[in-house]
């Protein structure tokens, strides 16, 4: 049965559709899509409320009773490691009077105990106290509300919808391509939280192209060959060199038993993508000098496995090398504000100071990320101007941004 929308929700939906009708294909969105509180509410309902969202990595909750919470809009979700090692997720709201059950961000508990009146739940979400006599209802009717959750190759995805957007092909591809990296046997070496003063779509649009990389990402440019392609530099000699690098790298990936193909969803705009690419000649990992920064991870026995790039709309991207991985989790918190958590992962047996140091592990992606946040904030300031008029995307260097916008408009207007 269709959900009955309140009058304000109906008006918001109609407003979004009217604004979408003004969009000119091949160009950026209208200003209101980056600034309007009403459109932001529709984003949260139609996109963030329906899609699978990256919540964390399984290695963040390795032991029975370990849990983390993830805030999305007005919702909070508990992700917990169950008695048999399974990953479960629940709405973080007590079935008594609605208090947060787990007010902290992480913890370990044999039971989930609400701090308000000590209502106690098992790690399976079942209420453990008798309520029939005092409350007139059987405790089986008062379990924590479950949340859809999938753990795939060390990644945890949750969905706030009872009927989330289909992601089965994505889960299967991620499981196959990411498995050699052994992220379920990793640990968080470091994390940094940022509040980026920009709409979440601008942050993701920036991630979808490297046209901006040559003037902004000196460190990233030294490690990544396809920056030159995205910058429109099609010098025949460079093109031939890149094609040779790719051919040699793919042969090496196959010899290592790695799936080197490019895989993405077949939906409009492709809401997920997963592909392995080579690094610049002389680079075995994404570091400032190309040299390893940590011990090999997962199943790798030798170095130079390129980098496995993953993107999942609306809130996740990750680069996984053979010695470390760096993941970014976006959370939309307002029309012009996005929380971004950047996490670095290494093998769980690696010891800081002996096997890796943060001054070598962090710089490339810390610098690149912070450069991006500046760009996104300047972009937000510009599109907020009364004089902003959407321009045009490059046909050869920003096609992925156009695909993202197509995907977004298709989903937010449904």
Task: Identify the residue ranges that each predicted region occupies.
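N-terminal pre-ligand scaffold of iron-sulfur
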Residues: 1-104, 148-152
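C-terminal catalytic domain of Rieske-type non-heme iron oxygenases
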Residues: 150, 155-414
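Rieske [2Fe-2S] iron-sulfur-binding domain
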Residues: 60-180
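N-terminal short leaders/motifs
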Residues: 9-37, 98-112, 143-153, 257-295
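Short hydrophobic core segments
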Residues: 43, 93-94, 113, 203, ...
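Short clusters of hydrophobic/aromatic residues that line enzyme substrate/ligand-binding pockets
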Residues: 55, 101, 127, 388, ...
């Amino acid at each position: 049965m269709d959900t009955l929308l309140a009058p304000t929700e109906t008006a918001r939906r109609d407003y979004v559709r009217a604004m979408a009708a003004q969009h000119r294909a091949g160009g950026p969105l209208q200003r209101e899509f980056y600034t309007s509180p009403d459109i932001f509410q529709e984003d949260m309902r139609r996109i963030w409320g329906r899609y699978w969202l990256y919540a964390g990595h399984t290695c963040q909750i390795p032991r029975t009773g370990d849990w983390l919470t993830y805030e999305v809009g007005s919702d909070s979700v508990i992700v917990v490691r169950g008695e048999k090692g399974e990953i479960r997720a629940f709405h973080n709201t007590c079935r008594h009077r609605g208090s947060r059950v787990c007010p902290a961000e992480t913890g370990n508990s044999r039971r989930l105990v609400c701090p308000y009146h000590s209502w106690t739940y098992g790690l399976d979400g079942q209420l453990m106290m008798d309520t029939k006599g005092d409350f007139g209802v059987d405790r089986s009717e008062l379990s924590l509300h479950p949340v859809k959750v999938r753990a795939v190759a060390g990644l945890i995805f949750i969905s706030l919808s009872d009927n989330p957007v289909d992601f089965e092909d994505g889960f299967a591809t991620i499981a196959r391509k990411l498995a050699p990296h052994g992220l379920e046997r990793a640990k968080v070496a470091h994390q940094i939280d940022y509040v980026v003063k920009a709409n979440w779509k601008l942050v993701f649009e920036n991630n979808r192209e490297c046209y901006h990389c040559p003037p902004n990402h000196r460190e990233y440019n030294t490690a990544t060959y396809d920056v030159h392609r995205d910058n429109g530099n099609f010098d025949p000699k460079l093109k031939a060199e890149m094609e040779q690098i790719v051919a040699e790298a793919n042969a090496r990936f196959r010899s290592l038993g790695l799936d080197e193909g490019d895989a993405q969803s077949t939906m409009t705009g492709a809401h997920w993508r997963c592909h392995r690419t080579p690094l610049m000649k002389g680079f075995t990992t994404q570091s400032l000098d190309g040299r390893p920064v940590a011990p090999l991870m997962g199943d790798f026995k030798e170095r130079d496995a390129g980098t496995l790039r993953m993107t999942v709309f609306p809130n996740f991207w990750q680069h996984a090398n053979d010695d470390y991985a760096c993941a970014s989790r976006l959370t939309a918190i307002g029309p012009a504000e996005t929380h971004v958590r950047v996490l670095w992962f290494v093998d769980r047996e690696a010891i800081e100071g002996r096997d890796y140091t943060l001054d070598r592990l962090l710089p490339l992606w810390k610098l690149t990320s912070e450069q991006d946040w500046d760009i996104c904030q300047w972009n937000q300031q510009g599109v907020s101007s009364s004089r902003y008029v959407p321009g045009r995307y490059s046909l050869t260097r920003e096609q992925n941004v156009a695909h993202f916008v197509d995907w977004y408009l298709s989903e937010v207007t449904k």
